[in-house]
Swiss-Prot record:
Belongs to the glycosyl hydrolase 13 family. InterPro entries: GlgX_C, GlgX_Isoamylase_N_E_set, Glyco_hydro_13_cat_dom, Glyco_hydro_13_N, Glyco_hydro_b, Glycogen_debranch_bac, Glycogen_debranch_GlgX, Glycoside_hydrolase_SF. One of its GO terms (molecular function) is glycogen debranching enzyme activity. It comes from Escherichia coli (strain SE11). The active site is at D336, E371. One of its GO terms (biological process) is glycogen catabolic process. This is Glycogen debranching enzyme. PANTHER family: GLYCOGEN DEBRANCHING ENZYME. The lineage of its organism: Bacteria, Pseudomonadati, Pseudomonadota, Gammaproteobacteria, Enterobacterales.
Amino acid sequence: MTRLAIGKPAPLGAHYDGQGVNFTLFSAHAERVELCVFDANGQEHRYDLPGHSGDIWHGYLPDARPGLRYGYRVHGPWQPAEGHRFNPAKLLIDPCARQIDGEFKDNPLLHAGHNEPDYRDNAAIAPKCVVVVDHYDWEDDAPPRTPWGSTIIYEAHVKGLTYLHPEIPVEIRGTYKALGHPVMINYLKQLGITALELLPVAQFASEPRLQRMGLSNYWGYNPVAMFALHPAYACSPETALDEFRDAIKALHKAGIEVILDIVLNHSAELDLDGPLFSLRGIDNRSYYWIREDGDYHNWTGCGNTLNLSHPAVVDYASACLRYWVETCHVDGFRFDLAAVMGRTPEFRQDAPLFTAIQNCPVLSQVKLIAEPWDIAPGGYQVGNFPPLFAEWNDHFRDAARRFWLHYDLPLGAFAGRFAASSDVFKRNGRLPSAAINLVTAHDGFTLRDCVCFNHKHNEANGEENRDGTNNNYSNNHGKEGLGGSLDLVERRRDSIHALLTTLLLSQGTPMLLAGDEHGHSQHGNNNAYCQDNQLTWLDWSQASSGLTAFTAALIHLRKRIPALVENRWWEEGDGNVRWLNRYAQPLSTDEWQNGPKQLQILLSDRFLIAINATLEVTEIVLPAGEWHAIPPFAGEDNPVITAVWQGPAHGLCVFQR
């Protein structure tokens, strides 16, 4: 058998140098590592990796070329109680592979065994890694670097956003190419979006349970190869990387940033009954948080938790993030269940991965957004992330819904959330933009469903409606489901307008869920993670042009208000904000806590948001000055109105003087 040259211990992964390929793999507890390469006929050829530098195994294969398919067999102890689950009968994915050939199907051969090892060889059906070469012309691409204070985030799914768009060519709908199509870019520009936040695009697998039910993982929060693009979103798997970069380059030319939702908290190997794809067989003890009995700490709800305090795993995660920035020019990340990033195992702001990101000249310069919780004790960490991070602000989400849909939130609590939740985020030198304000997200009801359903309707997910949260703070306005009388439709529309206005004219960084701006419904499903169908795909033919125009007008209005774009905390007397009652007087302490839900918010001394969240039409006395309603609450040409606004029940209006 041909022997490999020793090669180099860095960088991790498979790298072509023009003459051959250098292979490197981390494993602190392996006793032997075999590189397995497959020829055009599928014949397997095995080579021991001869180099062993610290915990890095490496070797160099002369004359190997891009397109070569490979995997690893890793030898070591099978000692489940100690956290070791080596099984050389199983072909393993390189954690740093840039492309994968094959599908991650539910098959007993892709399991290592629970208590006893399964020594049946699986190379015939296991997915293979592919060696790639990177040559791409970025031309004059430059990151937009939109200031945080001017950032408007649009959360979208690659397929769901584009698959049904009638003006995008059929052959590219649902793909990376569609994201860069002029029709999509023009839509985002007209809406006023500055950052497109994509649900996971790194390669993921559908859980075996879903496959057995005929479903699939649609959202993508089940990663299997963090350096590889999910091939189902590409017109051709071989060109996925260039298709993705073409889209990013086109978006950048339009001034739109691209933020990736990335999953560093767990892997698709799930619990001990889950499949064996990669990390579990390479070095289970190092990659995962292991309990004393050898099982996993399940702090993610997905069966396992990556140990992001282990030095090698920190290096792996950091290299992954740098890859997406340096190779694909992404502008930032949203981190799923990001409290795991700070676990040591207790949560710490100076956890190793946070420190590595802070000290990295590449990663410290991009937008970083945390979903600031996990499901373990002490996992709720909203407001506690390091200064470089912004965070999803669930306080804002719940407050906005309670104020407009449940009518049970005092004015003081509403104002606190409107002012970027300063009680939560104004610390450690952080700015208002650290609060990522949202009313909806991929996880939960859509905006339309918030006003049409009191209860979740997740039966299609196959769990007898047990999955998904029951704490929705929604209001169906008297009838469960879509449709209804003209009066019902109008009341729901008014609530949608109120929630959108609160989101887009409050301090902090707004995030809009794709489809909310044109009335997309998931028919009451608030956990549509496994619905790759018309329930989740945006139906552009049914889009409400009126609601889209309303949303766009709000976004463009936001950009005109200095108090919202200057990204500095509001202080009493600084001219940024004044809080007034229905008589244009400062609110008393009692009004803040117990007063009627009527409020006037004067921003930058020129823009006035008048709110009447009561059940009755109410006269609102505006502050001194000549006020006129402005779009989207009135047409462009409006006469100066009187000093009093007749506020409709559960209504609001924006004025300018």
